[in-house]
Each structure stands twice: as C-alpha cells, then as structure tokens.
C-alpha cells in the first residue's frame, strides 16, 4: 500500500469518506513529509501546521461531512493569494510583513469544501519569473533533481505537490505559470478560461491575463479542485456567470478518443524545441492516435508575435497594478527618506527585486506619452489576431496539443544572466493567456537526456474545460501517472 502522502487527492478523499483515514492522519502524513523534504526542496513560505492539525482534529470530532467534497484534504496555496491571518508576501520584501484580514475567493471555496490549508508556497516575486529563483526569500528546488529549477512562477506549488507535501496546490497562470512548473515537476497543471475562477483576493500582476488554477497529481484531482473553485463571484467583475460544467461526469464520458480531432500547430514543433521534449510529446500524440484520435495539421501564424505582445501587455499592467505599493498604507516603508517623494522612491527601490523593477520600468515606458500607440495599442491589436487564430483553428479541431515547454527543467543559475532567453521559453504557453482560453499540462514521460519530466499541453475552447479534462484523463490512463518524487 502506498504511503498516505503518495496517494492522489481522489484516493485520499475516498479514504476519508469511507472512514479508513482520518483528517488528522491525512494532515499528519503531509506534515511529516514536509519535515522530511522541505529542508531540501524549499517549496514553502508561511506554514500553519499546528493550526491545520487542530482543524483536522475538530473535523474528526464533528464527523465526516459528505457535503464537503474536499473534507480533510491537506492543500497548499501560492503566496499571491490572500489568506486571512496568514502572511501573504507575493515572494517580495515589500510585502514581507503583510498579513491580510480576508481570504481570496478561491481560498474561501477550498475551505468551504473542507480542505485544510497547510502552507503558502514560494514563488517568483509578484509572479514575475519562470524558475522560482526570483523569490526574495528562498530558491525552490525541483524534487526530481535538486540541482534544477521547478519552473515558475508557481514553482513552490508544483514542487510541494511533486514532493508529496500536499495533495493539491493552487497556483496562478499569467503566461504559463501553472502549466510550465507542472510540466517541469511531473504534475498536472490546469489554467482555466479567463473568468472561470474568481480573481478576488489575487494580488494582480497582469489583470487581463491572470487566472487561478490547480496543480495536482492526477487529472481527476484537477477536476475535483476546479469543480470547487470555479463559478461566478460578484466581487470580481471579470468573473463569468456562465454555469459550471460537471467536470467529474466529463471524466467518465470517454473510454477512448474515437472521433476526437487534435490540432497540431506547426509553430509549436519548430526551432528551439529540444529533442527529448519533441520525442516525448510525439509519442503521446501517437498514443492518442492509437486511442482513436485524428491528428489535424493547423497553423497559429500570429503566435510568432506572442512573446512581444505578452511582455508589452503584462509589463504595462504590472506597472499599473504595482503602483499601489509605495510604503504609505502597507508593506515595506523605507527608513531613509527625508520627504514624501523620497519615501516612494526608496520604499520601492528597497522593496522590489531587480526583475520586478525591470518589468515596472518597461511597463511604464510602453504606457508613456508618445509610446502608447507605438507599443501598447499595437500589442492590443495583435492580441486580437492571436485569439482569431485560435478561433479559426478550432473550426478544424476539438483540442490543440503541443509541448508545454520547449525544454525540461534547467539547472539553477543557468538562465540568471540572460532574462531574455528565459522570456523566450514561454513561447508555447503565453498565447493561451492572451486569448483567455483554457489549457492543461499533462505529464507524458521523462526526457532521455535530462531525466526530467516532460509535459504535453492540451488547449481547448473557451469554457470547455470538461473536454480538456476528459481527453487528458483518457491519455493519462494509457500513459500512466507520474509518482511522487523520492527525495
């Protein structure tokens, strides 16, 4: 029998429902695993282990509640999501001592469903990064190889799930920040459609791009978490009131992929794609064909502009969103200021890291008088063309598949002196955020050169997460799940 910490969320929830496992035992198993692995992995920031144990004991005393689908299940939450009474730093010195008085909507829904919050996960500062090396507090290590990065910016979430520290984690995806670390750590990572999950209580980076999604050990786990956190919230004006599909029912809708048309974009299989990623993803597509799917060649011609468009839009929105952190009402306040302007300048210079400062300055530049039309307005126009490419492609196919990342996890420090190259590695994920569509990263093997996990990205139509999950579930059953990393 597998160790408790190595089970899936689905297996754990079933054991809790059957009474063969108590909430305290589930929480204790994860705490023990945290104590065993966290000194090496560094996935977590604030922890609440004693509080979680107390909550679990109270739940056991009250008895199992069938109305709560995640009753007693220990989870972690990315440190960009507000948690009442628990520090929410966004991985930044400027918010080092900030403790919110409210929960983000997604966190509230986890709690209402019976989940037990164990910890906040490490992240690139304000979600600006692809390696979780840009946190102000620690560098997170990939559980499959501690010399390598876990991806980012939700690297702490992916590492905590891969290491068995929890059964699921909430991350955020602005340009691939759930899907890429999930790929690097051998997890399932789901970015829902923009507006499917409330962003209330999420500290914004790119308001038109950000979306909250789960990192889990199986597709069914992702479906269970999404079913809990999805749905309308009047506090977020961008949150859709469209009815939420029955994601668990969708998993049982297919036994194979007969009749499914999979679009394969030429632009996702060209220069820059590593041989080991190419091999794993093509083998996964071959298995999809064996299951009855038809591969359709498609084109997403404007994806070649996606990097430029994304970084113009994201940095402009970051410049605006992060203007609120000035040392006046909350966050870091400089002790070296003789005037109010100096307070603003010094507080932000001391509180923000280099990468955040770089993006704020670039964002301010593209929004400035004389450059707005040349950069931001043009980027917005091309963004629309990117969405139109997807709409046209989906006339020929039901889902689109390609690599989640052109490479596997790189070694720590390999990209630190070359931020541009790191930006370019987002090429396969950012178009989806610009279009606001859903995507899922599914583990499909291990690279022959690096020995690291590889993820296949499955992209879908707006609000059609049910199809993504059903397709991924069938593929997962054929390929097999990636187990917990042994550290």
Swiss-Prot record:
PANTHER family to which the protein is assigned, alphabetical: GLUTAMYL-TRNA(GLN) AMIDOTRANSFERASE SUBUNIT A, TRANSAMIDASE
Active site per the UniProt annotation: 78 (charge relay system), 153 (charge relay system), 177 (acyl-ester intermediate)
Pfam families registered for this protein in UniProt: Amidase (PF01425)
GO CC annotation: glutamyl-tRNA(Gln) amidotransferase complex
EC number of the protein: 6.3.5.7
Family label: Belongs to the amidase family. GatA subfamily.
Domain of life: Bacteria
Summary of subunit composition and partner proteins: Heterotrimer of A, B and C subunits.
Catalytic activity: L-glutamyl-tRNA(Gln) + L-glutamine + ATP + H2O = L-glutaminyl-tRNA(Gln) + L-glutamate + ADP + phosphate + H(+)
Enzyme's top EC category: ligase
Listed HAMAP family: GatA
Protein name in UniProt: Glutamyl-tRNA(Gln) amidotransferase subunit A
Any one GO molecular-function label of the UniProt entry: ATP binding
Any GO BP: translation
Keywords, in A-Z order: ATP-binding, Ligase, Nucleotide-binding, Protein biosynthesis
Known function: Allows the formation of correctly charged Gln-tRNA(Gln) through the transamidation of misacylated Glu-tRNA(Gln) in organisms which lack glutaminyl-tRNA synthetase. The reaction takes place in the presence of glutamine and ATP through an activated gamma-phospho-Glu-tRNA(Gln).
UniProt source species: Oleidesulfovibrio alaskensis (strain ATCC BAA-1058 / DSM 17464 / G20)
């Amino acid at each position: 029998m597998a160790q408790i910490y190595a089970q899936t969320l689905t297996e754990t929830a079933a054991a809790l429902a059957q009474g063969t496992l108590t909430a305290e035992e589930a929480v204790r198993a994860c705490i023990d695993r945290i104590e065993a692995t966290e000194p090496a992995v560094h996935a977590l920031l604030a922890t609440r282990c004693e509080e979680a144990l107390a909550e679990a004991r109270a739940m056991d005393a009250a008895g199992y509640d069938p109305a709560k689908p995640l009753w007693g299940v220990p989870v972690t939450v990315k440190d960009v999501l507000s948690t009442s009474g628990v520090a929410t730093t966004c991985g930044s010195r400027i918010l080092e001592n900030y403790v919110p008085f409210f929960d983000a909507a997604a966190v509230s829904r986890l709690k209402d469903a019976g989940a037990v919050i164990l910890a906040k996960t490490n992240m690139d500062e304000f979600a600006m990064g692809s390696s979780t090396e840009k946190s102000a507090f620690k560098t997170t290590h990939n559980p499959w190889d501690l010399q390598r990065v876990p991806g980012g910016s939700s690297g702490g979430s992916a590492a905590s799930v891969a290491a068995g520290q929890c059964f699921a984690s909430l991350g955020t995806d602005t340009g691939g920040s759930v899907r890429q670390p999930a790929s690097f750590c051998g997890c399932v990572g789901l970015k829902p459609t923009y507006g499917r999950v409330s962003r209330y209580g999420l500290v914004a980076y790119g308001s038109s791009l950000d979306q909250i999604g789960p990192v889990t050990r199986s597709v069914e786990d992702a479906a269970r978490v999404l079913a809990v956190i999805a749905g309308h919230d009047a506090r977020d004006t961008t949150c859709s009131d469209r009815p939420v599909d029955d994601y668990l029912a969708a998993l049982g809708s297919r036994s194979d992929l007969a009749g499914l048309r999979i679009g394969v974009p030429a632009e996702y299989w060209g220069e820059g794609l590593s041989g080991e990623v190419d091999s794993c993803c093509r083998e996964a597509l071959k298995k999809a064909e064996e299951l009855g799917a038809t591969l359709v060649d498609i084109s997403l011609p404007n994806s070649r502009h996606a990097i430029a468009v994304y970084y113009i839009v994201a940095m402009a929105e970051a410049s605006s969103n992060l203007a609120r952190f000035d040392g006046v009402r909350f966050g870091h306040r400089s002790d070296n200021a003789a005037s109010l302007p100096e307070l603003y300048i010094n507080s932000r210079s001391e509180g923000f890291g280099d990468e955040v400062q770089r993006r704020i300055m670039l964002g301010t530049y593209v929004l400035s008088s004389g450059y707005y039309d040349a950069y931001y307005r043009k980027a917005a126009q091309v963004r629309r063309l990117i969405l139109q490419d997807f709409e046209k492609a989906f006339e020929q196919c039901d889902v689109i598949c390609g690599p989640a990342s052109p490479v596997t996890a790189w070694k720590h420090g390999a990209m630190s002196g070359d931020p541009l190259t790191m930006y370019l590695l987002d090429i396969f994920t950012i178009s989806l955020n610009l279009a606001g569509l859903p995507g899922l990263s599914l583990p499909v093997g291990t690279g022959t050169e690096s020995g690291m996990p590889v993820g296949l990205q499955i992209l879908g139509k707006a609000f059609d997460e049910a199809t993504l999950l059903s397709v991924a579930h069938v593929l997962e059953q054929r390929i097999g799940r990636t187990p917990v990393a042994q550290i």
